Swiss-Prot record:
Alphabetized UniProt keyword annotations: Chemotaxis, Hydrolase
UniProt keyword Lipoprotein, yes or no: no
Protein family per UniProt: Belongs to the CheD family.
Organism for this UniProt entry: Archaeoglobus fulgidus (strain ATCC 49558 / DSM 4304 / JCM 9628 / NBRC 100126 / VC-16)
Any single GO BP term: chemotaxis
Known function: Probably deamidates glutamine residues to glutamate on methyl-accepting chemotaxis receptors (MCPs), playing an important role in chemotaxis.
A GO molecular function held by the record: protein-glutamine glutaminase activity
Gene3D superfamilies: 3.30.1330.200
Name of this chain's protein: Probable chemoreceptor glutamine deamidase CheD
The protein's Enzyme Commission number: 3.5.1.44
SUPFAM superfamilies xref list: CNF1/YfiH-like putative cysteine hydrolases
InterPro entries: CheD-like_sf, Chemorcpt_Glu_NH3ase_CheD, Cytotoxic_necrot_fac-like_cat
Catalysed conversion reaction: L-glutaminyl-[protein] + H2O = L-glutamyl-[protein] + NH4(+)
High-level lineage: Archaea, Methanobacteriati, Methanobacteriota, Archaeoglobi, Archaeoglobales
């Protein structure tokens, strides 16, 4: 296992031979991209489904995060055709809020699915929804993702 790199809210990181970690995924979604040939991976902590017109480019938005992470991986020699994705998060932390506008977790997940499809990137596994926060560890040496739940328990995806 390589060094651990923390990915903050609204940030992304790309690395080889490291463990990328993001904490506090409630309605936010952690998107991991992986190139198995290069053993190169990236992780973003996305807060919102899409940016508005004229919004500064930031990984806190799903549309920008996928674009920025893909570009960073391609600069390091990755081919988009080889990249696969994993996602975790998108919880409905406040179950009593049912208005669609407040269902940020669902909206984040759907936006990411659409963007990845547009980029031709296949989602190979996901752990989305529910009502529990998550911490994600993404192992760039082999593409595995460990999801730890805020109330205990874990899942490898």
């Amino acid at each position: 296992m390589g060094s651990e790199i923390l990915v903050g809210i609204g940030e992304f990181r790309v690395a080889k031979g490291a463990v990328l970690k993001t904490i506090g995924l409630g309605s936010c979604v952690g998107i991991a991209l992986y190139d198995p040939k290069l053993r190169l991976g990236g992780l973003a902590h996305v807060m919102l489904p899409q940016s508005g017109n004229g919004t500064k480019r930031s990984a806190k938005y799903a549309d920008h995060a996928v674009e920025m992470m893909t570009e960073a991986m391609e600069r390091l020699g990755s081919d988009r055709k080889r990249i696969v994705a994993k996602m975790a998060g998108g919880a409905q932390i406040f179950k009593h809020m049912t208005m669609d506008m407040l269902r940020i977790g669902d909206r984040n997940a759907e936006a990411i699915r659409t963007i990845l499809r547009d980029y031709g990137i296949r989602i190979v596994s996901e752990d989305l929804g529910g009502d529990e926060g998550r911490t994600v560890y993404f192992f760039t040496n082999d593409g595995r993702m460990l999801v730890k739940y805020s109330r205990g328990g874990e899942l490898w995806i």
